[in-house]
Amino acid sequence: MLVIFLGILGLLANQVSSQLVGQLHPTENPSENELEYWCTYMECCQFCWDCQNGLCVNKLGNTTILENEYVHPCIVSRWLNK
């Protein structure tokens, strides 16, 4: 049991250390209740608000909703210093 726990802990530590400095994990299809938090506390927040066939149709950048202006893969990237 202890060996399994240590193995899982090692895998988690490996994933965290392979992350780029200053980058948090991307989140696909963010929930609406996270929007206010991310846009308040992150210097740069980009949301895919309406994901259609893997593409972002409506995008929110900073605090302004831009409809049908950007089309890119549906992910949310939270960069600390960009």
Swiss-Prot record:
Keywords for the protein's UniProt record, in alphabetical order: Early protein, Glycoprotein, Signal
Top-level taxon of origin: Viruses
Induction: Expressed in the early phase of the viral replicative cycle.
Keyword Signal among UniProt keywords: yes
Signal peptide range in chain numbering: 1-28
Residues bearing glycans: N62
Pfam family for this entry, one: v110
Role of this protein: Plays a role in virus cell tropism, and may be required for efficient virus replication in macrophages.
Family, per entry: Belongs to the asfivirus MGF 110 family.
Protein name in UniProt: Protein MGF 110-5L
